[in-house]
């Protein structure tokens, strides 16, 4: 029903029932079964009281499923498993909420435009890249990191209102509204001159974390709005290269809009860029301009 809640804490330990929202437990948790495993660690390495000789949660769960005839076959296989380079402990994977670009909505158009590109070898364009587009999924845009381009989205305290900021000038205006609402004392970008694209002007501000996270905006209904903590996938930066290098749309609009310096006549990169640069260039160009980003390409390696 879409209602979800973490069952494992950041230490890799299953929550005990008392630590979980009682309404969620009542409607979604098999308390009799869960109680047998609550409080245990997903991996023994995360429990300082356990050793490699102790029973592991995954084996106990497998045995339980086999006893209840819910597992067809249970057996051990030796295989590689990722470990943290700092702690040497096994990596745990957590499902997280993310921001996506709905690239599946333009899948067919991306396929059509790809057929107009002169690929060398042609088999890469038709095969590897073509198949990638045919099996396209939505683009996971956000990243839970610290260094990088901040996601310019602010969300109200109750989560019902969102603002996506499109320029520094717009952000400065929104901060002024926040000051008037009493949420901020002063504008950290005071002195920044909108429309002045000189290095000296931009040296006055810092749009990265942690500074941008201190900015509180005001929603249309008067609520406080806080920035989403995630960053933008660095591949989006790479895919936006044709426009970003010209500071589009704030400068040199005619170069892009009139296709004076876009799309590129030629690019070249390794075949591994099928899911990287080739894709992000193609995806952004299709969605923003209904165009290819490059006319000819050599894919080596």
Predicted regions and their residues:
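Residue patterns forming the tRNA-binding/recognition surfaces of aminoacyl-tRNA synthetases
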Residues: 1-194, 207, 277-278
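Conserved active-site neighborhood of enzyme catalytic/cofactor-binding cores
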Residues: 57, 115-120, 131-132, 136-138, ...
């Amino acid at each position: 029903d879409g209602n979800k809640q973490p069952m494992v804490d950041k230490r890799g330990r299953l929550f005990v029932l008392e630590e979980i929202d009682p309404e969620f437990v009542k409607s979604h948790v098999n308390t009799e079964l869960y109680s047998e495993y609550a409080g245990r660690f997903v991996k023994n390495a995360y429990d300082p009281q356990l050793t490699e000789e102790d029973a592991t949660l995954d084996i106990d769960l497998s045995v339980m499923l086999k006893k209840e005839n819910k597992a067809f076959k249970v057996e051990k296989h030796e295989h590689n498993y990722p470990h943290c380079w700092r702690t040497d402990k096994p990596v745990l994977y957590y499902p997280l909420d993310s921001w996506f670009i709905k690239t599946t909505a333009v899948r067919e158009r991306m396929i059509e435009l790809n057929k107009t590109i002169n690929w060398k070898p042609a088999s890469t364009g038709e095969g590897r890249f073509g198949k990638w587009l045919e099996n396209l999924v939505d683009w996971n845009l956000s990243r839970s990191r610290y260094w990088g381009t901040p996601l310019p989205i602010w969300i109200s305290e109750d989560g019902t209102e969102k603002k996506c900021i499109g320029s520094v000038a717009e952000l400065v205006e929104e901060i002024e509204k926040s000051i008037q609402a009493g949420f901020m004392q002063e504008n950290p970008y005071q002195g920044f001159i909108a429309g002045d694209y000189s290095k000296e002007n931009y040296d006055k501000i810092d749009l990265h974390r942690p500074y941008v996270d201190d900015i509180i905006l005001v929603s249309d209904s008067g609520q406080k709005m806080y920035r989403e903590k995630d960053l933008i996938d660095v591949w989006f930066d790479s895919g936006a290269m044709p426009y970003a290098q010209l500071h589009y749309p704030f400068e040199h609009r005619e170069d892009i809009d009139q296709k004076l310096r876009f799309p590129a006549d030629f690019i070249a990169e390794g075949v591994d860029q099928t899911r990287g640069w080739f894709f992000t260039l193609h995806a952004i160009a299709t969605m923003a301009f209904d165009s290819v980003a490059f006319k000819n390409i050599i894919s080596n390696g």
